[in-house]
């Protein structure tokens, strides 16, 4: 399996898109840092320590939540379209590797990039915040970044199913992921009116609720009093996303085998 993962990483290494993944980690921290430095925003935070918590929450809770599904979708399209574009499905049948093993290697690579992107976004936030804020609590923020990388990637797998199913162009895959991110953010603005089961059924809003609740437990200045009844525990979040991931991977495996026939 490690050799398969290494092989998939080597394939992506040839793509010029990958360096952009790391650069995109600065896409939200930089403008949000300037936004946090405005007098109107400074009035909301009593000191520079709390201000940094606010910056971290906005970057991870809005920027990463929006951008990472798009990044995962594009990388997934690259991974799953390579064999189709190069017409190598027949060649793959001659090697002693099952399609399920190949699928798992590709999925693991998606999770690796999901975690890397979140860690890069976290470090970008630290770098930007260090100029005007007091940096603290890095151990917890590091843990949250890793968890968000795993959770958001798992929550994006249903979209990967659609990417593999339609098997269209990269542009179509990007548009599909952008629509998914926008739809998720739209749902998040309706948390107060939507039923609990619907909020938990949608992966990205579920992750957002978990992140907000977990950050509040660790002293972040977030007003989530109106959402207390629908905030899931870590166990509930892992359980729900785990079921979604298993179903999605099974569907991806089925569709991938079918496309190779």
Q: Which positions does each model-derived feature cover?
A:
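Alpha-helical transmembrane segments of multi-pass membrane transporters/permeases
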Residues: 20, 167-182, 186
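Secretory targeting signals
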Residues: 24-74, 104-170, 227, 231-234
